[in-house]
UniProtKB/Swiss-Prot annotation:
PANTHER family: DEVELOPMENTALLY REGULATED GTP-BINDING PROTEIN-RELATED (PTHR11702), MITOCHONDRIAL RIBOSOME-ASSOCIATED GTPASE 2 (PTHR11702:SF31). This is GTPase Obg. It is found in: Cytoplasm. Mg(2+) binds at S173, T193. Residues 160-333 form the OBG-type G domain. The gene is obg. One of its GO terms (cellular component) is cytoplasm. Pfam families: GTP1_OBG, MMR_HSR1. One of its GO terms (molecular function) is magnesium ion binding. The keyword Chloroplast does not apply.
Amino acid sequence: MKFVDEAYIDVIAGNGGNGCVSFRREKFIPFGGPNGGDGGRGGSVYAVADRNLNTLIDFRFARRHEARHGEHGRGSDQFGAAAEDIVMRMPVGTIISDAETGAPVAELLEPGERILIAKGGDGGFGNLHYKTSTNRAPRQKTPGWPGEQKKLKLELRVLADVGLLGMPNAGKSTLISAISNARPKIADYPFTTLHPNLGVVRVGPEQSFVVADVPGLIEGAAEGAGLGHRFLRHLQRTRLLLHMIDMAPFDDTDPVAQAKAIVAELKKYDPALYDKPRWLVLNKLDVVPAEERAARVKDFVKRFKWKGPVFEISALTREGCETLVQAIYQHVASYQTHYVDPDVRFAEPEADESDDEPRFAPQADDPRFR
């Protein structure tokens, strides 16, 4: 299935049904009084997080999502039926924002999470509501309230514990296929990976973590060069970044220069992403002659001025992969809860204790509170 991580949709909630003006008419009862029913509630639009989805492709081609209107009220105290709600299933990790203003609406972080994104209109009142001791035959009614209409932007950020970072052809896809159940396309040319791949790494019966492989970065990615900049947002929810280095490039490129370029692009794109825990993974050491391996690794670490964890592996032969997997799991397991950091745009401001206004105040134009 094609991977789509961005889509624009229109959601339209249903209008409430109109109230009814009606009077009781029966034999020998000349003044039966009002019996007009209320209108039904319009259908609302909900978003639900589905763990079985990993793309927004369904919303790329079906942009308009409209709920039905509520039924009108009728005589004999018959209230209109409420319209059925619309439930849109989206991948876990979807961020919903206003397409016109960019204001955040909601984000789906937990499987099964259900969020209201467009509320259906309330039904109008029938004349039964306006009967008083002085007005025995009211002819007032109210129309149904309109439902909300919104133009929304959907943005998917995959939920993974570990993200793979590096230049094209650094061996990221080979590593994720070696340690997990993912089977991405692997070839001996750059930009083989065109969209993010997720893999679940099983450490034990109930011990696992999720790895995300994104397309490789090149210099200038923060300004739009290459493919990686489009998918860097998928690394923003990870707990750990693995910076993979090709220690045996097929041309005469300098691995240190490439590594510094990646770090620079990461810092330009998002300082918070740059500040995440990052480990150095030196790959393709099976190609390096055994007598040169230690010297080449030492030279790289010295010139790169790296002081963090370093792992020497060969994703192709799986040499050193088990040690890396165990270390990753220990790091991920140190986070006792599975809480996902929400997007900073959704941080709720602290309540002002000096605010004396009621938390739930009736709207001034609501006829029910006049």
